[in-house]
Design a protein with these regions (language model features):
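Glycine-rich phosphate/ribose-binding loops and adjacent secondary-structure elements
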Residues: 2, 217-407
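Ordered alpha/beta subdomains of enzyme catalytic regions
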Residues: 1-246, 251-252, 361-407
């Protein structure tokens, strides 16, 4: 069987920005991640071994000179030594992985080790599982490249004609690397055509979160951070201070760059109650990844106004399992309120004829700040009950504490 991940940078930008943040703030931290399949999929017999073979192959995948040159040129907020010394020397270590499969076919995947190292596994695990399943269940054999390009092209025209500012964030649950590349080609071509037809009076293609494909296509690369930074910080400084402390530490590391903050890890109230004007000014916007988008827009706009900030100077990035129709609804709601943009994943990169996308994630479940300290459970609550992940006892405890604080 073909190898699925063949490029070191076939990963999302936030993996690298978070990795550098970790090296600066928690270089000795250790973490454990767990794979969650929200559909409780029963995988084919032997899938665990096939997946392990795919992931062990990554031990031979290293960053190339071309990739280092691209990252050095494109990401000035990442220092030269990080890209050209640290990443050059980085090697995937499959000993960090534990992969098992029960008699019913359910997968149990754990990643455990130094945080700066284990963070690299999330995207490869998810994209390998997704593509491997589409190969094994026959979806890949039925795939019609010309037809799927045409469908993506028409989607693109709809996006740009409706005025959406949008980029691809579909690495983790994509149909395949080749399909993600084909989708990006279609988005580029449709954007160029609509832009020409309208003299630029249309939406905007903001690029892709995938570093490798941004390099191949010479387009912008999107991404800032992930929930795990806040989830880990909670075990250090508590649920009421973790958002502020990550904002402060992130701004110390990046000095105003990569400034979209993902605020919903423990719900919206605890974030907005502790958002200072300095932090709101430092970050260029907020990413909405859960909750009812219109309600979240109202909360964000009101908070900015309370702080004396014009919301139209700030950005709201929407990324909560969107399709194009839903993005258009949100866009119309945002007009005159806040500057909006969209990151769309599965609906672009796994919306393939007669194919059911996976509903899978890899999340941080435990952490400790050094190898000599005790382990603590790491959880994520979000603004959607369906997205709550982690140790149930801790989730219940934090929810009770937050509910009591809001009374």
């Amino acid at each position: 069987m073909k190898t699925i991940i063949n490029h070191f940078t076939d990963n999302d930008l936030y993996t690298f920005t978070c990795m550098y943040y970790i090296l600066q703030k928690y270089p000795r931290a250790e973490t454990e991640y767990c794979f969650f399949d929200r559909n409780r999929t029963c995988y084919p017999k032997g899938f665990d071994q096939m997946l392990r073979e795919q992931l062990e192959h990554l031990e031979n995948v290293v960053i190339t000179d071309e990739e280092r040159a691209f990252m050095t040129r494109t990401f000035p907020f990442l220092p030269y030594w990080f890209i050209n010394v640290f990443l050059r020397g980085y090697r995937f270590n499959s000993k960090e992985l534990t992969i098992t499969q029960d008699e019913e076919g359910h997968l149990d995947i754990r990643v455990k080790g130094k945080w700066w190292s284990t963070i690299m596994w999330e995207m490869p695990i998810l994209s390998a599982i997704s593509e491997l399943m589409h190969i094994l269940n026959g979806d890949a054999l039925k795939y019609d490249a010309e037809k799927e390009y045409a469908r993506s092209y028409e989607k693109g025209r709809q996006i740009w004609e409706c005025g959406l500012t949008l980029g691809d964030m579909g690495t983790r649950r994509r149909f395949s690397f080749e399909h993600q590349e084909r989708v990006i080609d279609a988005l580029i071509a449709s954007y160029d055509e609509v832009k020409s037809e309208t003299n630029g009076q249309c939406g905007k293609f903001t690029g892709t979160s995938n570093v490798c494909l941004a390099m191949k296509k010479n387009i912008p690369c999107l991404g800032t951070m992930s929930h795990q930074c806040i989830s880990f910080e909670e075990i250090v400084s508590g649920v009421f201070e973790c958002n502020y402390n990550v904002m402060n530490k992130w701004s110390e590391v990046y000095d105003g760059n990569v400034g979209i903050f993902l605020y919903d890890c423990f719900g919206d109230n605890v974030f907005f109650n502790n958002l200072s004007k300095r932090m709101a000014m430092t970050f260029c916007g907020l990413r909405i990844d859960s909750g009812v988008e219109e309600e979240q827009v109202d909360l964000i706009v009101e908070k900015y106004k309370q702080l004396g900030i014009d919301p139209m100077t700030k950005q709201a990035v929407f990324s909560n399992g969107l399709n194009i129709e839903r993005a258009i609804e949100i866009h119309n709601y945002c007009k005159g309120k806040i500057t909006d943009s969209y990151g769309v994943g599965t609906f672009l990169t796994c919306d393939v004829t007669d194919c059911k996308p996976m509903n899978i994630v890899v999340k941080l479940i435990r952490g400790r700040i050094t190898e000599s300290r005790e382990w603590h459970p790491c959880v994520k609550l979000s603004c959607d009950k369906g997205k709550t992940l982690g140790d149930k006892a801790k989730c219940d405890y934090l929810l009770s504490v937050l509910n009591e604080a809001n009374q």
